[in-house]
């Protein structure tokens, strides 16, 4: 089980901003306490952050929906480094490693 966060690298965000956005994504993705969440918690809470541009993120969201994999999109309020309404990242999962890897294995670590 793993949770993958696709972080936008095609917009300018500082490291602190990226960390905050990743936390928002992780909290949002794990807010529904279903059996996948419980399994993820019991198996080490693996989290991986990968680089992506907006086109790739939107493509991966569509692929997840087709495969029944939960996603959580972070839309920024625009108070600091990006414009209001900017999609900064998306969380995928938590779900089985194999299912998530099928969608995200072509992306590189942040």
Where are these regions (language model features)?
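Glycine- and Gly-Pro-enriched alpha-helical subdomains that act as flexible
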Residues: 2-33
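Short basic, glycine-rich beta-strand/loop surfaces that mediate nucleic-acid
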Residues: 4-6, 43-55, 66-110
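Low-complexity, intrinsically disordered basic tails/loops
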Residues: 26, 41-43
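Flexible, glycine/charged-enriched surface loops at secondary-structure junctions
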Residues: 35-40
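Short amphipathic alpha-helices within nucleic acid-binding modules
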Residues: 57-62
